[in-house]
């Protein structure tokens, strides 16, 4: 049997379509344009294809993480076949000054965690300034973002492990100073 280019193209096309429908497909990224309804409804819909391929892996609460490392837990809302970022979404949007016309790129990491890159209306990635978020003291690895007001009380608060780390750094500095003083004494004696 002679295989022609058309036969190869049809076979490739069929196998490509089958791999796209595979529920184990590695679709990990999607983007969303922030529409007026997103801001008005205070929730954002996850694209249907992503839901079809990855929706069963998502727990009731997901974590959004920005490139600056800020994390926010968002409760999902399931309506029929649709899944929406819901409770916590409007606070995340407000904390990052997300507005109509912004473009968001979501990358699913695992364990219901998404990395979110935010592009503003100029089509450039937004800055993620520290003073645009409100960090709540927490003993776990999740830093909660709650709004634009960043008061000095929370600025000065540290998690217990950060306080412990500061103590260790202080002890290392003290030991270094003592070591340098001892070396200076040896040089003067010697």
From Swiss-Prot:
Q: Where is the composition biased (Polar residues)?
A: 12-23
- Looking at the record, which segments are called Disordered? 1-25
InterPro entries linked to this entry = B3_DNA-bd, DNA-bd_pseudobarrel_sf, Plant_B3_domain
**What compartments host this protein?**
Nucleus
Q: What name does UniProt use for this protein?
A: B3 domain-containing protein At4g01580
Q: Which residues bind DNA?
A: 29-122
Q: Which GO molecular function entries does the Swiss-Prot or TrEMBL record give?
A: DNA binding
- Keywords noted in UniProt: DNA-binding, Nucleus, Transcription, Transcription regulation
**Gene Ontology cellular-component terms listed:** nucleus
Q: Which CDD domains match?
A: B3_DNA (cd10017)
Name where it mostly resides.
nucleus
């Amino acid at each position: 049997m002679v295989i022609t280019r058309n036969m190869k193209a049809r076979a490739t096309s069929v196998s490509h379509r089958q791999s796209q429908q595979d529920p184990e497909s590695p679709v990990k990224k999607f983007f969303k344009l922030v529409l007026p309804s997103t801001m008005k409804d205070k929730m954002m819909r996850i694209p249907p294809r992503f839901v079809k391929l990855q929706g069963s892996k998502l727990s009731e609460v997901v974590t959004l993480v920005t490139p600056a490392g800020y994390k926010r837990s968002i409760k999902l809302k399931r309506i029929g076949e649709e899944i929406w970022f819901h409770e916590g979404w409007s606070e995340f949007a407000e904390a990052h000054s997300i507005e109509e016309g912004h473009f968001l790129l979501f990358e699913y990491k695992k364990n219901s965690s998404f990395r979110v890159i935010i592009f503003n209306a100029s089509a450039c990635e937004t800055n993620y300034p520290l003073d645009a978020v409100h960090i709540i003291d927490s003993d776990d690895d999740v830093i909660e973002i709650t709004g634009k007001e960043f008061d000095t009380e929370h600025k000065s608060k540290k998690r217990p492990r950060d306080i412990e780390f500061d103590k260790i750094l202080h002890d290392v500095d003290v030991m270094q100073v003592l070591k340098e003083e001892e070396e200076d004494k040896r040089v003067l004696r010697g």
